[in-house]
């Protein structure tokens, strides 16, 4: 999951609706486990809740996440479970071929603004901007713990 992390750059948990209302694929086993940021300051734990939903523990907070693939891009819908409003973050994540590195990036709210009223509107904007280099924020890299 690419997570501009603070709402997994999850200070990006600002959207009222998910990208997709249901997961678009199953949990990927290689993503599960404990991860540490490249600078060693942040810890990320990914667990499977069921066959399609991840539970994410990040910096003392819990999140629910699932794949929301759009326009051949591996988006992830991330929901903050600690807040009362349960808002969402939109991220991408990319697992390295050796499965030891996970890169996360959040969707830029200047390209996909808050206030979209339904998932169809979110999907339309993400599809339209899939090749836009401004779509994503900074990348955060995590290394898998042994």
Residue positions per predicted region:
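Calycin-type beta-barrel ligand-binding domains and close structural analogs
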Residues: 14-31, 38-146
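C-terminal motif of bacterial Sec signal peptides marking the signal peptidase cleavage site
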Residues: 9-12
């Amino acid at each position: 999951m690419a997570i501009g992390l603070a709402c997994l750059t999850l200070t990006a948990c600002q959207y009222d609706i998910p990208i997709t209302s249901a997961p678009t694929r199953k949990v990927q086993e290689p993503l599960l486990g404990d991860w540490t940021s490249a600078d060693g300051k942040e810890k990320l734990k990914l667990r499977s809740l069921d066959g399609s939903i991840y539970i994410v523990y990040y910096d003392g907070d819990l999140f629910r996440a699932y794949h929301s693939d759009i326009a051949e891009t591996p988006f992830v819908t991330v929901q903050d479970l600690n807040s009362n409003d349960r808002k969402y973050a939109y991220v991408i994540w990319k697992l390295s071929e050796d499965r030891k590195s996970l890169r996360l990036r959040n969707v830029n709210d200047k390209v996909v603004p808050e206030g979209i009223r339904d998932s169809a509107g979110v999907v339309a904007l993400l599809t339209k901007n899939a090749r836009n280099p401004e779509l994503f924020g900074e990348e955060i890299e995590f290394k898998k713990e042994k």
